[in-house]
């Protein structure tokens, strides 16, 4: 640089063809001066052990799996690598790859002997372990490359992959369908068992044995009281005389009933029934005109009352519902006896169901009460015109639908708060709550199984 003038130095700086030295050019000189080996030069100390048994089997009968042409490899050098990458674009983009290839080349050149040494050592180990390894391991080694080849074929075949994915989806859908069917069957089974348990609770318990002939004593006392009532009715019938009826028609003979004798008692009741039917037959001609007379009078009076008061008379309502009232009274008496025999849980179940239904309807805002309040609000709806405006201009407005979501929430006037609901459930079943009801419901059952079932349900009781 010192022999050049200043103008020449500036010209070299501004010129585009600046010669940049290539540091990789030194490797080509080394390759050109590389000493070629002849034969087994430098490997005289190696011991020839021959191929291993596994390699011989794979090479001989295994179709040349490890000795095929694709496993042989290709010898190359740095000159050939650099000759293939002469393009400028490839050099600029792949500088890192060239450095990696140089490193690999160094490793290949420097480690050829190491690889051969490792292969020889592997062959020695295989020969030393021939007695320990069996033929099963050899067969496994032969079968290993086949699944890899099949997997590579499937990966390259998109139709097969789509078919496999579709088959998996079909299997998944069938499994989900089976799961849903199983779930429905389990629900049906659970409902059936629940109904059976409820029905078993309604079955009356078995009657106890008769202690000391208590049933016979009660039967005799009931028959005695019925006999006394029968005699009183016959005496009353003899004292009543209908118009046109003779005294001989009403006269009845004496009936004797021996207590403690079933045969004589049966004969007594048969005779009393015959006499009662005979009296009814003899008094029928006299009773019929009397009943027709008073029936026509009552019917005429009821029609007059109905036309005047439109059925508002209590007497008229009683006359209309006379027969039904008797039946209802009898049924109410029977139901009261049944209710007396029921437990606390069974007797209060209907009332608690109604209370729970009211709670749910009030919380959800559905039901007849909510409908009535909605109708009242519709009637009392505000006018569209604003009253604050003057007479000449009425301010009319409509609430935007999207703006309704931003209105402050107004609590329900008749709604139930959380504290009220908690208080209701805590006061159920006479103040014992859900736990006390479930304890009473499980009387007669196994205590251990009942406690486990309640623990799983968390104290919740399903009616």
Curated annotation (Swiss-Prot):
State if Repeat is listed as a keyword. no
Q: Where in the cell is it found?
A: Nucleus, Nucleolus
Source organism, top-level taxon: Eukaryota
Naming one, the record's GO cellular component terms include: nucleolus
- Where along the chain is composition biased (Acidic residues)? 83-92, 99-144
Pfam families assigned to the protein according to its UniProt record, in alphabetical order = AATF-Che1, TRAUB
Q: Which stretches are tagged as biased composition: Basic and acidic residues?
A: 31-47
Alphabetical keyword list: Nucleus
Q: Could you tell me the Gene Ontology terms of the biological process aspect for this record?
A: maturation of SSU-rRNA from tricistronic rRNA transcript (SSU-rRNA, 5.8S rRNA, LSU-rRNA)
Q: State the InterPro entries in the record.
A: AATF (IPR025160), AATF/Bfr2 (IPR039223), AATF_C (IPR012617)
Q: Where is this region: Disordered?
A: 14-174
> Which family would the database say this protein is a member of?
Belongs to the AATF family.
Protein name in the entry: Protein BFR2
Q: Which gene specifies this protein's sequence?
A: BFR2
